[in-house]
Amino acid sequence: MAPKISISLNPPYNGEFYSSNDQMSGIVSLQLTKALSIRKISVILKGFSETLTKIDQEYMFQQNGMMMPGQDNKSFHTLMKFEQRVFPPDNVWNALDGSSKPFKVKPGSYNYSFQFDKFPRKPECLKNHTAKTVAFVTRNNARLPPTFNSHWQEFNKIDNLDLYFYSFGKVIYMVQVQIELGKSSSWFKPFHKLIREIETFEFIPEPKDLIVEPDEDDNEELNAFSNNSRGNSLVTNNEFFNSSNLKVPSKDVKVVNGVGYIKSDRNFSQANSILIENGDIRSRPVSSVTSTRQSTRLVNGMKVFPSTYKMGLPDGESNMRIEVRSRDLKQIYRKDYLFRSGSQNFDKVYVVMEGNIASLSKMQITPLKLQLNLLETTTYLSQGIANGNYSSLKLIEIDLNQLKSNKPLLDLNEIRENFDGSMFECELRLKDHPILRKLVFNEEDYRHRGNRLYSFKTCTIKRIFSLQLLIEWGINGIRKQSEVNIDPVQIFCQVREHVEAEALPRYVPPPTYTEMAS
């Protein structure tokens, strides 16, 4: 009967997942029903990422003039690997002086403890990156990535097509026990037999190591290849976006030491698989080009996120748009308030109008419904081919008029004009809505397709999020909809640390002393 091996990991410090400050430790239990020749027992702590990308048949036909099967491209990166021998002890191992003679271990139960150092900050695979490596990160901003898609390790057990393509990228961490048995005396079995047992675990770095830094454009060795594509007829999960293709403009491409690097992937909204070959970028022909990039500006120290488009008003001359103003909307932690006053997220929303003030004051403009979506873009890269997956999560959908309040959310009597009188604005007081002001982000620690909600970027996987605020309006009986996109937004699955100022010690008057008469 084969030996029975079990791995018991000590729980992480936060009780949920292992982080940068944890030291992986635990106990290996070995049960033998009969004597066994064992040379050594090792515990291996390792992590790796793997991606699989495809080029569809339409692209292959345009390049070669003939129908060819889709091409698979695979990539494998070792993120870390540490090994610790737990049997035999060091003094015995050193005394063997290189001898391969095994130990005869009697039947029974044996426990071996192990402990590793803290997790490294940078992945081990960086030392294998060459000048021709195409990656999403540079050597400077590469960090050890979090666990991702570790539940979907066998493709043949996935019956959902969207999830099937989504599972093409993985980051897996595990503890592996490896027992090396004694060499067989038979000449046709010259190698040591190995018995292995693995235990996967969830690792998520500290928030500072999860931040997706913008692509760098300097003279250092650039390994970043960023393809924020929206639409691949083969591998795109289009829960929200439509498929289309776009040729990447040559002015947005920089090649450094043979490495393809897209200087800014936010100048185009829809693209297909990108192929880098000999420093040249080749892609499928353009079928449509629709830019949805919103320009932002600063007002009184706050960043302004305008709506994607302006809405025409009934007088035929005036228009209105929505603006979200915030100092800190680019980062959202779990349990952050979204609309509450002082949250610096959606607590300052304004309706900005252009036109004749007399005409505007006569209009009936009422917010009817609100919907807030979290949009996920996950891109996998392998051998210069990038495939994208897209999905949307509805955070809240609410009828704004369901609960009546004493004061309307939008009061046009409070409209004010800017310094030159060309525009007028009025605050949309979503922070006063009794439901919205209590809404917090991801209170239940939701797992989307098996993964917690967090942004990250590593060599071959990039997962970014954006927020979409949709408001339905009633304007003189006509329904219209506004849209504001916050792109990108850094999402954390950790709860924000609130640093409270330490209270000053209470003043205690000093004791009084009297001179004693001599």
Curated annotation (Swiss-Prot):
There is a cross-link at K118 (Glycyl lysine isopeptide (Lys-Gly) (interchain with G-Cter in ubiquitin)). It is found in: Cytoplasm. GO terms for cellular component: cytoplasm. Gene3D superfamilies: 2.60.40.640. GO terms for biological process: endocytosis. It comes from the Eukaryota. It comes from Saccharomyces cerevisiae (strain RM11-1a). Belongs to the ART10 family. May regulate endocytosis by recruiting RSP5 ubiquitin ligase activity to specific plasma membrane proteins in response to extracellular stimuli. This is Arrestin-related trafficking adapter 10.
